[in-house]
């Protein structure tokens, strides 16, 4: 999820805020604390009511008899295995004793609201759809659309493809 913001702080045009000495967007503490968000999540095994510890065992690549393919259903949150302490990353904190699903939602909101998301994602999309070397103006226009639309991908793709530089 931290890959959504890139490695260095960016201006809206996709260039580093300090080109001569780039500022990292996150560090080891951010990574460790964000990893704690995912504690208590595992596959949705049939034993989750009677033997939840079985849901955290690695059974190999074969599926136990009587089980359906566990990789085709959403993961399940197991509150008893979730780290209930507060988690601080990217300068924001998820409060202690927040249930696993709410912790995940709040964490994704923290990442999505980071100032790097709009320019980083916009530049990546432009590079995949139109040109590998977009101008800073092109990135700024698309990043502004991304930000103003709260990250709506349909609106962002339209801005990418309808921009004069895409023609």
What are these regions (language model features)?
Residues 1-167:
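Active-site substrate-binding loop specific to GH73 endo-beta-N-acetylglucosaminidase modules
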């Amino acid at each position: 999820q931290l890959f959504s913001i890139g490695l260095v702080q960016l201006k809206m045009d996709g260039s580093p805020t300090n080109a001569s000495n780039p500022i990292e967007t996150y560090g080891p503490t951010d990574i460790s604390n964000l990893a704690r968000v995912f504690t208590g999540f595992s596959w949705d095994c049939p034993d989750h009511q009677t033997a939840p510890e079985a849901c955290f065992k690695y059974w190999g690549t074969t599926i136990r008899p009587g089980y359906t393919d566990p990789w085709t259903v959403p993961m399940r949150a197991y509150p008893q295995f979730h780290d209930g302490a507060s988690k601080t990353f990217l300068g924001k904190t998820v409060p202690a004793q927040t249930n696993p699903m709410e912790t995940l939602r709040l964490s994704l909101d923290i990442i999505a609201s980071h100032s790097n998301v709009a320019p980083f994602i916009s530049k990546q999309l432009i590079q995949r759809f139109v040109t590998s070397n977009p101008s800073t103006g092109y990135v700024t226009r698309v990043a502004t659309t991304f930000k103003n639309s709260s990250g709506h991908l349909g609106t962002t793709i339209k801005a990418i493809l309808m921009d004069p530089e895409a023609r």
